[in-house]
Each structure stands twice: as C-alpha cells, then as structure tokens.
C-alpha cells in the first residue's frame, strides 16, 4: 500500500482524492493526510459537492482534525470509513511526514516546484514527491504517463507530472512522430477558465486577465512548447503554441497542426490513433467520431480524446487534429498512475 499525502487541496488536490476512490486505486493507495490552509468544513463541502464533477459518490464528514471518507451510507460514527489527517501548515519543513510514514507527497499547491522544494518534503520525512505542474528544470524527472514513465528510476525522488496540456498533446505527438515523422508543429490550446482569472473586471498583473472570465475569450501566455521539448529534446524550436481561455468551467480542446514527412490521408492518421488507443496507449488516449461538444468530455479519465471527424490533411503532409481533455479529471488520474509508477521504479 502506497501511503500518500496531498499538499494543497484545490481543484487538482480534491480531484486526486476523488480519483483514488473512483478509479479503484484505493486498494493500492492510501491517503493519510491533506495539508490545506482552508477550514475543514469548506474542505469537506467542496470534496462532497463539485460544480464540474458533481457529487462525490462517497459520503464525506469531518471534524477539526480529520476528513472521513465513508464506505457506505451509514450515519456518521457507523460503518467503515477512511480517516485522513487535516493539516494547516504553510511551511514544508513543519509538515509531519515522518510521523505519518508518508511514502509520497502529491504536491498540488501550484506554488512549489523546484528540486529544493521537493527536498524540503523529503527532509520532513517523505520518501518521494510528485508535483502537479511542470516545475523547474532541475527536477529528477518529468513524466507524461504512457509516454516516458518507463524512464523512472528508484533514485528519482522529486518528479513533475507535467501539465494537463502536455499530458493531452504529448501522447498524440508521440504516435504521429513514430508513424509518420514530424517536422514541426503549432498548437492552439482552447482552455476553460481558471481560478487565476477574475469574475468581474479587477486588477491583475496580466492586463488581459483583469477582464471578466465569463465575458471574453482571453489570450494567455503558455509554455507548452517548452514542455514538449522537455519530453522530446529532438523537437527543440520545432513547436510553437498559443493559448486562449474560454468561458467554460472545465474541459479543454487542443488544435494541433503538424507537418509530417510521410504522405498521408485522413484515414491513415485516424487509424494510427485508433490503433494506439487500443494497444500501447489504452486508457491514456481515446478516439471518437461522435458529434460531441466539450461538456461530453467532462469527467473523462483519458489524457487525450481525438475527435476523428475533425481531422484534416492538406497536401498530404500538413495534418490538423482536434484533441479534447478534461484538464482536471484526466490529469488527476495521471497523477495516480505516475505515483504508482514511482513506487514500482527499480
């Protein structure tokens, strides 16, 4: 049993805890603690009720020091439940990971992300750390599960899980490059609103993000091309990306255009994705030609879902694809896959 602690109980932290149970991985992963500055009542409420993902199928209760995940519908104090320690500490070095025998910290704060931060968790008693965002270049490894998780080694103690968008697009790039050879590419990320945007116009260091999230399509900076280069150094200076935020609360679409070496038709491209989704990337990549819209991919655990009805090929070598992902739920599920891969690494 892998004992994990979740540091930061925001969108990703709460989804990670839900995914432990909804994916069935609670047989392999035990969450022993959550560190979050918010009050226990709010933590329990937002875990139980979620605007994007609906009501959690497990009943949640709490006291001032614990969250309780009940295995059945019995009243509080009866039936089986899992007890999760609640902590409210802002300094990593004060966290009681040693006393709690924590094997792995899932750091979902979005604040910490360099090797030194990870080592602070380890000094506090954790054995390993997995960050929920790209992190600094000095980490032991950055993993896009399904693409390079087999590069994990036992000595890789401070690891990044990449970003939701790299987890979405990198598996597709891998498939296309192995099948046809990629020369270069561009990506437009069409991303749902995030909590770094404003409900109504208000001050922000990024002037575009001073504007109300629900009223505009808002361009934002992205380092997605750098994330691709980190996984595939061969594509240094070969990809560029832009990103816009749109007034939806969840699910992201990625418009991928690549120039390839091989002369192909639409069916060649789509069949390659289908084959990967049924074999090497099963559970990571999915494929559909149904006439779906963004809400239909909400709570989908795959990293990427290719809409084959939108694949286009120009002059045999320019390929355009539409790739969907639930930027919260898919990423949370990959956090758990990577956590187990870190545990198993030799």
From Swiss-Prot:
<feature type="binding site">
    <location>
        <begin position="222"/>
        <end position="223"/>
    </location>
    <ligand>
        <name>substrate</name>
    </ligand>
</feature>
<keyword id="KW-0664">Pyridoxine biosynthesis</keyword>
<dbReference type="GO" id="GO:0005737">
    <property type="term" value="C:cytoplasm"/>
</dbReference>
<dbReference type="InterPro" id="IPR020829">
    <property type="entry name" value="GlycerAld_3-P_DH_cat"/>
</dbReference>
<keyword id="KW-0963">Cytoplasm</keyword>
<dbReference type="Pfam" id="PF02800">
    <property type="entry name" value="Gp_dh_C"/>
</dbReference>
<dbReference type="GO" id="GO:0008615">
    <property type="term" value="P:pyridoxine biosynthetic process"/>
</dbReference>
<feature type="binding site">
    <location>
        <position position="209"/>
    </location>
    <ligand>
        <name>substrate</name>
    </ligand>
</feature>
<feature type="binding site">
    <location>
        <position position="327"/>
    </location>
    <ligand>
        <name>NAD(+)</name>
    </ligand>
</feature>
<dbReference type="Pfam" id="PF00044">
    <property type="entry name" value="Gp_dh_N"/>
</dbReference>
<feature type="binding site">
    <location>
        <begin position="163"/>
        <end position="165"/>
    </location>
    <ligand>
        <name>substrate</name>
    </ligand>
</feature>
<feature type="active site" description="Nucleophile">
    <location>
        <position position="164"/>
    </location>
</feature>
<dbReference type="GO" id="GO:0042823">
    <property type="term" value="P:pyridoxal phosphate biosynthetic process"/>
</dbReference>
<protein>
    <recommendedName>
        <fullName>D-erythrose-4-phosphate dehydrogenase</fullName>
        <ecNumber>1.2.1.72</ecNumber>
    </recommendedName>
</protein>
<feature type="site" description="Activates thiol group during catalysis">
    <location>
        <position position="191"/>
    </location>
</feature>
<dbReference type="GO" id="GO:0051287">
    <property type="term" value="F:NAD binding"/>
</dbReference>
<comment type="pathway">
    <text>Cofactor biosynthesis; pyridoxine 5'-phosphate biosynthesis; pyridoxine 5'-phosphate from D-erythrose 4-phosphate: step 1/5.</text>
</comment>
<dbReference type="InterPro" id="IPR036291">
    <property type="entry name" value="NAD(P)-bd_dom_sf"/>
</dbReference>
<dbReference type="GO" id="GO:0048001">
    <property type="term" value="F:erythrose-4-phosphate dehydrogenase activity"/>
</dbReference>
<comment type="subunit">
    <text>Homotetramer.</text>
</comment>
<keyword id="KW-0560">Oxidoreductase</keyword>
<feature type="binding site">
    <location>
        <position position="245"/>
    </location>
    <ligand>
        <name>substrate</name>
    </ligand>
</feature>
<dbReference type="InterPro" id="IPR020831">
    <property type="entry name" value="GlycerAld/Erythrose_P_DH"/>
</dbReference>
<comment type="function">
    <text>Catalyzes the NAD-dependent conversion of D-erythrose 4-phosphate to 4-phosphoerythronate.</text>
</comment>
<dbReference type="InterPro" id="IPR020828">
    <property type="entry name" value="GlycerAld_3-P_DH_NAD(P)-bd"/>
</dbReference>
<feature type="binding site">
    <location>
        <begin position="11"/>
        <end position="12"/>
    </location>
    <ligand>
        <name>NAD(+)</name>
    </ligand>
</feature>
<comment type="similarity">
    <text>Belongs to the glyceraldehyde-3-phosphate dehydrogenase family. Epd subfamily.</text>
</comment>
<dbReference type="InterPro" id="IPR006422">
    <property type="entry name" value="E4P_DH_bac"/>
</dbReference>
<keyword id="KW-0520">NAD</keyword>
């Amino acid at each position: 049993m892998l004992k994990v602690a979740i540091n930061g109980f925001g969108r990703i932290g709460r989804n990670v805890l839900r995914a432990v149970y909804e994916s069935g991985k609670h047989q392999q992963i035990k969450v022993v603690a959550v560190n979050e500055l918010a009050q226990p009542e709010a933590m329990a409420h937002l875990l139980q009720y979620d605007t994007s993902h609906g009501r959690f199928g497990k009943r949640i209760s709490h006291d001032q020091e614990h969250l309780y995940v009940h295995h059945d519908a019995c009243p509080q104090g009866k039936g089986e439940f899992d007890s999760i320690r609640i902590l409210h500490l802002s300094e990593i070095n004060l966290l009681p990971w040693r006393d709690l025998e924590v094997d792995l910290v899932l750091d979902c704060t979005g604040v910490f992300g360099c090797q030194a931060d990870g080592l602070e968790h380890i000094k506090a008693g954790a054995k390993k750390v997995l960050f929920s965002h790209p992190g600094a270049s000095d980490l032991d490894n950055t993993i896009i599960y399904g693409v390079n998780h087999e590069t994990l080694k036992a000595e890789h103690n401070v690891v990044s899980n990449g970003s939701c968008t790299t987890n979405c697009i990198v598996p597709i790039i891998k498939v296309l490059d192995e099948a046809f050879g990629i020369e270069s590419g561009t990506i437009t990320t069409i991303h749902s609103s995030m909590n770094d945007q404003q409900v109504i116009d208000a001050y922000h260091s990024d002037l575009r993000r001073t504007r109300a999230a629900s009223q505009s399509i808002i361009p934002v900076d992205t380092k997605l091309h750098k994330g691709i280069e980190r996984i595939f150094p061969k594509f240094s200076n070969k990809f560029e990306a832009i990103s816009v935020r749109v007034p939806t609360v969840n699910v992201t679409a990625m418009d991928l255009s690549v120039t390839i070496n091989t002369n192909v038709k639409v069916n060649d491209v789509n069949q390659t994705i289908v084959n990967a989704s049924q074999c090497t990337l099963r559970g990571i990549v999915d494929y559909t030609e149904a006439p779906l819209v963004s809400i239909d991919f909400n709570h989908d655990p795959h990293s990427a879902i290719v809409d084959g009805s939108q694949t286009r090929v120009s002059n045999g070598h320019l390929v355009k694809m539409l790739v969907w992902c639930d930027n919260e739920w898919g990423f949370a599920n990959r956090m758990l896959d990577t956590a187990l891969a870190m545990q198993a690494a030799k």
